[in-house]
Amino acid sequence: MANIKAGKERTKIFGRGSHECLLCGRKQGLVRRYNIFFCRQCFREWAPKMGFKKLN
């Protein structure tokens, strides 16, 4: 019983789990370039609306 932490858990301030998607909250597959912080699924949906174009 001595191993139980008292108080709230520490939040992650760096690394892969520290950021999340601004739209859905997912932490995996983030597009962090240009400070977008969208997951790849949300980025595919919103990229044309933001002005990104798919090249061949």
UniProtKB/Swiss-Prot annotation:
MF terms (GO), sorted A to Z: rRNA binding; structural constituent of ribosome; zinc ion binding
Family matches, as InterPro entries: Ribosomal_uS14, Ribosomal_uS14_arc, RIbosomal_uS14_euk_arc, Ribosomal_uS14_sf
Entry cofactors: Zn(2+)
Domain of life, per lineage: Archaea
A GO BP entry: cytoplasmic translation
Family: Belongs to the universal ribosomal protein uS14 family. Zinc-binding uS14 subfamily.
Function: Binds 16S rRNA, required for the assembly of 30S particles.
Subunit structure: Part of the 30S ribosomal subunit.
Protein name from the UniProt record: Small ribosomal subunit protein uS14
Highest classification ranks of the organism: Archaea, Methanobacteriati, Methanobacteriota, Stenosarchaea group, Methanomicrobia
